[in-house]
Amino acid sequence: GLLGSIGKVLGGYLAEKLKPK
């Protein structure tokens, strides 16, 4: 659903932000 889609986007954003370079 909509919340699931938002969760995927936020999760991916946080994963990229927290990922060590």
Swiss-Prot record:
Compartments, as annotated in UniProt: Secreted
The protein's name in its UniProt record: Dahlein-5.4
Role noted for this protein: Has no antimicrobial activity. Strongly inhibits the formation of NO by neuronal nitric oxide synthase at micromolar concentrations.
Keywords in alphabetical order: Amphibian defense peptide, Secreted
Highest taxon in the source lineage: Eukaryota
GO MF annotation, one: nitric-oxide synthase regulator activity
Tissues and organs where the protein is expressed, per its UniProt entry: Expressed by the skin dorsal glands.
Gene source species: Ranoidea dahlii
Gene Ontology biological-process entries: defense response; negative regulation of nitric-oxide synthase activity
Pfam family, one: Antimicrobial24
